[in-house]
C-alpha cells in the first residue's frame, strides 16, 4: 500500500467540469487581472469566514507584507514572531527594514509561547505576528488583550489554519489582520500561488486594497508605498470551485486527526503535538516528535508511507536570521530536530490511516 501526504487528484475530479467552464468564460472576457471572479472569491471568503473584509493577494508571503505595510511597520520597528515558522514570516519583517524579535514556542502544540512574548515587548514593539502552526491556533484572546493594552497590532499568520477556531471563533475575530496562503498543499489550495488578508477594520481594508496594487488610490495614481500583490483571476476561479467542498473536507480532516490522536497517544516513544482544548484544529497536519526521525522516516518510506518535516530548521538556525537568535529559546529547536508529519488529507480512507498507524507500531515493535 502506498500512502501519500496529500492527494489533489480527488478534489480535481469534483471541480474539473465547472472549472473548465469558468476558464473558457475567463479567456473570452480576458479579464485576467482583478476580474469579476476576484470580487466573487473575496465575498465568498468573507462569508465562509464570517469576516467583514477580504483582500485577495498573490501569495501568503505577500499577505504578510501587505498586512505589515497597512499597519505602518517601518524601519527599526520591532515585530515579535515565533522561532518555529516558515521563512517568510521573518523575511517579510526584514524586507520592510523592521527588526524581528524571536519568541519560543510551546512543546505541546508548536504555537508561540505567550509568556515569552510578554517578556520581549518594548517601546519599539509595533506588532506581534502569531503563527497558527499545523492548524493549531494560539490563545489569541490572551494575545489580543496584551496587544490592546500595549496599543500594538496583532497579525496572525494563518497559512496553515484556514477553518480552525479558538473558543469557537475564527482568528480574525481577535486580530487586526489575519493572513492566509492558498499554496496548493494547503487545506484550501489554489493551482499556483495565492493568498488573502482578512480584517474587520474598514480603514485597514481600504489600505490593503491600495497597497496590493502599487499603492494606487485610482488608476496610475499612487498615494502610498505598495507592491504588485494582486491575486490573479485564474486562481480566483479555482478557489471559488474548491470552496464548495471545504467544509466537508475540514470535517473529514478532523475525523482523521482524532483517529491518529486516539491510536498514537499510548505510544510512549513519540509525542503528538495537539491543539489546546479550546482549539478546533482544521486537520492541516499530524505532527509527532520522535528521536532519530530520519531512521523512522526511512522505515516508513520502505513501507510505502510518505512523511514530511515542518520544519527542519527554526528561523534563527538559518544564516539569514542567525544574528537574531536568543540562546534561551529551546522548544523550537527541539521541534525542528524531531518533528515528523504523517499523511493526512480529506480523501484518505480509514484503512489507509489504520495502515499508517500499524506501520508506526511495527517500527516500535508494539503488538496489539
Role assignments for model-derived ranges:
Residues 55, 80, 101, 154-155, ...:
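Structural detector of well-ordered beta-strand residues that form the stable sheet scaffold
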Residues 9, 21, 36-43, 48-52, ...:
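PLP-dependent aminotransferase class I/II
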Residues 156-191, 206, 218-223:
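Conserved active-site segment immediately N-terminal to the catalytic lysine
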Residues 1-31, 36, 343:
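N-terminal "arm"/small-domain region of PLP-dependent enzymes with the aminotransferase-like
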Residues 69-149, 153-158, 165:
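PLP-dependent aminotransferase-like
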Residues 63, 85, 91, 343-346:
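Conserved SAM-binding loop
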Residues 92-93, 146, 170, 187, ...:
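Hydrophobic/aromatic ligand-binding patch that stacks against planar heteroaromatic rings
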Residues 30-78, 92-96, 102-104, 169:
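Phosphate-binding glycine-rich loop
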Amino acid at each position: 500500500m502506498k500512502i501519500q501526504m496529500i492527494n489533489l487528484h480527488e478534489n480535481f475530479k469534483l471541480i474539473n467540469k465547472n472549472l473548465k467552464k469558468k476558464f473558457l468564460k475567463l479567456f473570452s472576457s480576458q479579464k485576467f487581472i482583478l476580474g469579476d471572479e476576484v470580487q466573487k472569491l473575496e465575498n465568498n471568503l468573507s462569508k465562509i469566514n464570517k469576516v467583514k473584509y477580504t483582500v485577495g493577494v498573490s501569495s501568503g508571503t505577500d499577505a504578510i507584507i501587505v498586512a505589515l505595510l497597512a499597519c505602518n511597520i517601518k524601519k527599526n520597528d520591532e515585530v515579535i514572531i515565533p522561532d518555529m515558522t516558515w521563512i517568510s514570516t521573518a523575511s517579510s519583517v526584514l524586507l520592510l527594514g523592521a527588526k524581528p524579535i524571536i519568541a519560543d514556542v510551546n512543546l505541546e502544540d508548536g504555537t508561540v509561547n505567550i509568556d515569552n512574548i510578554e517578556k520581549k515587548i518594548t517601546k519599539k514593539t509595533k506588532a506581534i505576528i502569531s503563527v497558527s502552526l499545523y492548524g493549531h491556533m494560539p490563545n489569541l484572546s490572551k494575545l489580543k488583550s496584551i496587544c490592546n493594552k500595549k496599543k500594538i497590532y496583532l497579525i496572525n499568520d494563518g497559512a496553515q489554519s484556514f477553518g480552525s477556531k479558538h473558543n469557537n471563533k475564527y482568528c480574525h475575530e481577535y486580530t487586526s489582520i489575519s493572513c492566509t496562503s492558498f499554496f496548493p498543499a494547503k487545506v484550501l489550495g489554489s493551482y499556483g500561488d495565492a493568498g488573502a488578508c482578512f480584517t474587520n477594520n474598514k480603514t485597514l481594508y481600504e489600505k490593503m486594497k491600495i497597497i496590493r496594487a502599487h499603492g494606487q488610490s485610482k488608476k496610475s495614481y499612487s498615494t502610498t508605498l505598495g507592491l504588485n500583490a494582486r491575486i490573479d483571476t485564474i486562481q480566483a476561479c479555482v478557489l471559488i470551485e474548491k470552496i464548495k467542498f471545504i467544509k466537508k473536507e475540514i470535517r473529514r480532516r478532523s475525523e482523521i486527526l482524532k483517529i491518529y490522536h486516539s491510536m498514537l497517544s499510548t505510544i510512549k516513544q513519540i509525542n503528538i503535538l495537539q491543539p489546546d482544548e479550546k482549539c478546533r484544529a482544521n486537520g492541516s497536519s499530524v505532527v509527532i516528535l520522535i528521536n532519530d526521525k530520519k531512521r523512522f522516516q526511512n522505515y516508513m518510506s520502505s513501507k510505502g508511507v510518505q512523511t514530511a518535516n515542518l520544519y527542519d530548521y527554526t528561523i534563527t538556525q538559518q544564516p539569514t536570521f542567525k544574528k537574531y537568535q536568543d540562546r534561551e529559546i529551546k522548544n523550537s529547536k527541539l521541534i525542528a530536530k524531531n518533528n515528523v508529519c504523517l499523511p493526512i488529507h480529506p480523501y484518505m480512507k480509514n484503512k489507509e490511516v489504520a495502515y499508517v498507524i500499524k506501520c508506526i507500531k511495527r517500527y516500535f515493535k508494539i503488538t496489539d
